[in-house]
Each structure stands twice: as C-alpha cells, then as structure tokens.
Amino acid sequence: IEYQSMNRKQGFPAILEHRIQLSDRINGTLTRPPGASGDVPAMVIMHSSGGIIPNTWEWSKFFLDMGIATFVVDSFGPRGITTTTMDQSQLSYPASTVDALLALKLVAAQPGIDAKRIGVIGFSRGAAAAAASSFENIRAAVLGDSPLKFALHIPYYGGCSQVGTTTGAPLLYFVGKEDDFVSAELCTVTVGKMKERGANVADYVQYPNTYHSFDVENDKPRYYIANAQSWKKCILGQDMDDLSYFADGKKVNLQEYNDYYQRCMTRGATIASNFQAKTDSRAKTKAFVSKVFGL
C-alpha cells in the first residue's frame, strides 16, 4: 500500500512547527493472519539501517502466528536507498518517525483492523521511530485532531537520547550491553529519565555479552563493519517537550548539537547474533503484546 510521507531531509522542528512536506511516496506491506475473523490487532514493523531483510519477514510471521496483522514499512526502497549503515544522513530519523505514525493512520483505516490495538516494533534505526512515535507532541503534530495512537512501542537496540511526555502507551526496550553502534549506558540513563516524566515503561531489558542486531541470524555469527557509523561515544540528549538539546552534559543550540553529533561519531561497529537473547526477547515480546492486546 503506497502512501505519502515526510521529506527525507526534514527534522523534528519541521514536525512541531507544522512544516511537514509530504513529498516522499513510500509503501508498506499489509498481511492479515490466516483465517482471521472480526477486527484483529496489528503491528507496524520498522526496519533497520539495512532495510527490509529476511529477519523482518520472520518478525512478521511471528506476529501473524499470534493472530496479529502486520504492516511492514519500506522507508528505503521507494526513496532509492539501499542501506544507511555507512551514511545515516540519507534519511532523517524524524522522517522515519513520520513514516511510522502515518502507517498507523493508514492501517487503522483498513477494514478488519482494530484501530485501538495497533502497536509498533522497530529495529536499530527503526527502533528510533518506534520510540519517538510515543511522544505525545510528535503524535499530535503528525496526526492532527485524530485520537489515534500506538497501543504499544517496542524499540530493539535503538539509540536512546530523547526524553519527553508520552501518549501513555507502554514501552518495552531491548538493548545489548556490548552494542557498539549505540550506547547501552546512555539508554539506561534515558529510560530512567523517561520514567521520571511518567512514561509507562513496561520493561527495559539489557542483555550482557550481547551486540547489535542480536536477533538476526547471518552467515557468520559475528562480523565487524569497518565503515559503519557509530554514536556509542556520544553523550547526547534531546528534550522533546521543548525541543532543547544537550551534548556532553551541557545544554546547547541545534547547530552546536549537530556539530557535536558529527564530531563524536566514530567508524566501525559489530553485528552479532545471540540465540539466547533472541529467544528470551521474543518470549518477552510475545507476553507483552499478548497482555496489551488482550490475546
């Protein structure tokens, strides 16, 4: 299903100042669980920096087997992007967030879908969208007067630097302690701040001896991408309520934040599957989704 979404270069100020340019046509694949009757819940699936991979469809099947429809968003293909691992500037993270929220609107309008039971799960870059779509002011700016909101948010190994007032929908976070794309330490701090703001954090799961993309099975159990962009060394913060920025513990303006963001970025990161973490996270995901959706 094709739909219009935000210009790939726009940022959060454009969203909150109602300057979104719906210039990018993207698409997603809606799959319903076989033999479904009545209105079923749905999960919007946001892919990683590698785009849609076999693991994306594995997750789709995982939810379909639970009797949940899935909508796999393709933020890359229609925009002519293959991967953003070496260059994340090809698509802004806010644009991915808008991709997710407009997918919610699209899926909610489909027959046979329960609009009150639509969740979002995202991986790496997609996790940033799964998390940012929980902020009430972002949701309201994108969806306008509509009361639509995601029923739950599941960010898998995404960067955690944003805090703010959420819609109240529960969040379930997963991260590997050894992740060298993003900082697990920063995630711990950020999730703590989210709780202070009243966020409904169902669980924050950090796996020891676990790297990025731990749920993805590859030809090699572990490999190093020398040219991958990493922000593990960055101490970043964004307050989404007033759109203030923090770098290295200090409050800064947007230009200073962007300068620091480029400066603290390093090259080289690890992808490693971890069967134990994958199995445990899937069990926790299943229990969480079942509880929220009342399955």
Predicted ranges, named:
Residues 1-38:
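N-terminal cap/lid segment of alpha/beta-hydrolase-fold proteins
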Residues 15-16, 92-168, 180-181, 185:
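Primarily recognizes the serine-hydrolase "nucleophile elbow" in alpha/beta-hydrolase
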Residues 201-295:
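C-terminal catalytic histidine-bearing segment of alpha/beta-hydrolase fold enzymes
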Residues 173-175, 179:
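Short beta-strand/loop motif that positions the catalytic acidic residue
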Residues 84-87, 159-172, 220:
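Flexible "cap/lid" loop of the alpha/beta hydrolase fold
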Residues 34, 48-49, 124, 159, ...:
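Residue-level signal for short, function-critical loop segments
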Residues 58-59, 169, 183-193, 219:
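Short alpha-helix in the alpha/beta-hydrolase fold that links the catalytic acid
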Residues 15-26, 39-112, 226, 262-270:
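Serine-hydrolase catalytic machinery in alpha/beta-hydrolase-like enzymes
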